[in-house]
């Protein structure tokens, strides 16, 4: 994973800088998220890395497939990635772009996994906790995973807090087996 981050970072930094200067951060974010979804498909990954397929032909077909979702500046970006065999990095680039944007706008994206749906008061309390923990406002992305039994898992900015019963049981089992 860190190798992907190392390879993707220069692209993500350059794209974010260009988007910021052009004032079209939202358009870039939307396009990158779309490209991330397209490249998540295993068939697309294979096609992008197939040495038998001509790069120019692949790029033309890829751009045609993405028509309506790619901003004008994005076409050159896609051509650059595809020509350098780096189109598979677009998911990592999209994630890094989102992190840069969050930092620029003064918030942090937080993945919240709970054992049950949160009530509004719990979400408010969690937001306050995240703001104290990360020294920035949190934008919560809540998912429910009943296997946690109870509690919550928070993932933000490379940090993880596992306050779930499932996590506690796993840690206990690990200690007992050692």
UniProtKB/Swiss-Prot annotation:
It holds the Pfam family OSCP. It is found in: Cell inner membrane. GO terms for molecular function: proton-transporting ATP synthase activity, rotational mechanism. Gene3D superfamilies: N-terminal domain of the delta subunit of the F1F0-ATP synthase. Keywords: ATP synthesis, Cell inner membrane, Cell membrane, CF(1), Hydrogen ion transport, Ion transport, Membrane, Transport. The keyword Transmembrane helix does not apply. It is a peripheral membrane protein. F-type ATPases have 2 components, F(1) - the catalytic core - and F(0) - the membrane proton channel. F(1) has five subunits: alpha(3), beta(3), gamma(1), delta(1), epsilon(1). F(0) has three main subunits: a(1), b(2) and c(10-14). The alpha and beta chains form an alternating ring which encloses part of the gamma chain. F(1) is attached to F(0) by a central stalk formed by the gamma and epsilon chains, while a peripheral stalk is formed by the delta and b chains. PANTHER family: ATP SYNTHASE DELTA CHAIN (PTHR11910). This is ATP synthase subunit delta. It comes from Methylococcus capsulatus (strain ATCC 33009 / NCIMB 11132 / Bath). The gene is atpH.
